[in-house]
A protein has these predicted regions:
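Glycine-rich nucleophile elbow surrounding the catalytic serine of serine-hydrolase chemistry
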Residues: 99-109
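Catalytic nucleophile-loop/oxyanion-hole region of alpha/beta-hydrolase
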Residues: 62-94
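Aromatic pocket-lining residues of Rossmann-like dinucleotide-binding sites
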Residues: 54, 110-114
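Short, surface-exposed alpha-helical segments at coil->helix boundaries
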Residues: 44, 48, 73-76, 203-207
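Glycine-rich His-Gly loop
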Residues: 33-37, 101, 195
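N-terminal cap/lid segment of alpha/beta-hydrolase-fold proteins
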Residues: 1-26
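The alpha/beta-hydrolase serine catalytic core
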Residues: 4, 10, 14, 96, ...
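Short, surface-exposed "cap/lid" segments of acyl-processing enzymes
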Residues: 13, 23-68
Length: 248
């Protein structure tokens, strides 16, 4: 059952959807999903469908939209606001995080930042980076990345539309060493899913994330697939569902 919600975030209203689990026992646990750069909570409909499937009989799911193209510091603050809302209103026994791409970096920083209130029981990193610099040079291009470091606004025109992003988006990235944060993940289940042919966040970054993290960890490469897992999204979703069932 889907329920829309809106909360007061640190930089304005945050809107999202709760999939309240169809099984009463499943409502004791919540998966919070964080989308990627220039993405949305619906994920072209696929993330919404996965949330529906998980919410049927595994656990409740919360997904939401970050402020558009906001920098990592702001995304971390917004994810914390959503987690506060989840803990206060849903009172779950276990909270899980699932971060796609840049949302994965947001989850790592939030989960491993040393605040117990924001540390989940388990975490899924879906096409998530290990090096923000390497990743955003690939995403933006070397020239645009370097120009942003010198204060020039980032202008993107592509199939996703026209976006003008403040240069502080790039300079803010240098405040966060994702790898150093992830080294603090010492216990708890961790599932890493990554496309074998990902050219946006290279597959070696998933391997590095797997090697430096602790806990009960699992790395699954999606054979022949890209950053968005266009070929094997359904298979990746089944991995997430199976992993949740084992850890609830």
């Amino acid at each position: 059952m889907r329920q829309n919600f809106t909360i007061a975030g640190p930089f304005g209203k945050l809107s999202g959807v709760i999939n309240l689990c169809g099984e009463e026992l499943g409502r004791r646990h919540v998966l919070v999903m964080a989308h990627g750069f220039r993405g949305s909570m619906d994920g072209a409909g696929r993330a919404a469908a996965l949330a529906d499937e998980i919410g049927e009989n595994i656990c409740s799911v919360v997904r939401f939209n970050f402020s558009w193209c906001t920098m990592l510091s702001n995304q971390v603050a917004e994810l914390k606001a959503v987690l506060d809302f989840v803990r206060e209103t849903m009172r779950p026994e276990k909270v899980f995080l699932l971060g796609r791409s840049f949302g994965g970096a947001t989850c790592i920083v939030t989960a491993c930042g040393g605040e117990d209130a924001y540390r989940p029981y388990g975490m899924v990193l879906w096409s998530a980076p290990n090096s923000l610099k390497q990743t955003f040079i690939q995403v933006l291009g070397e020239d645009i990345f370097q120009e942003a470091l010198h204060g020039k606004t980032i202008v993107l025109d592509d199939e996703r539309g026209h976006d003008e992003i403040p240069a502080t988006f790039v300079t803010d990235l240098f405040h966060y060493d994702v790898a150093e944060f992830l080294k603090k993940w010492k216990k708890g289940p961790l599932l890493i899913i990554h496309g074998e042919n990902d050219t946006t966040v290279t597959p070696d970054q998933a391997k590095e994330n797997f090697e430096i993290a602790g806990g009960k960890k699992q790395l699954c490469y999606m054979a022949g697939d890209n950053h968005h897992l266009d070929l094997r999204f359904k298979e990746a979703g089944e991995l997430v569902k199976s992993w949740l069932k084992k850890n609830i």
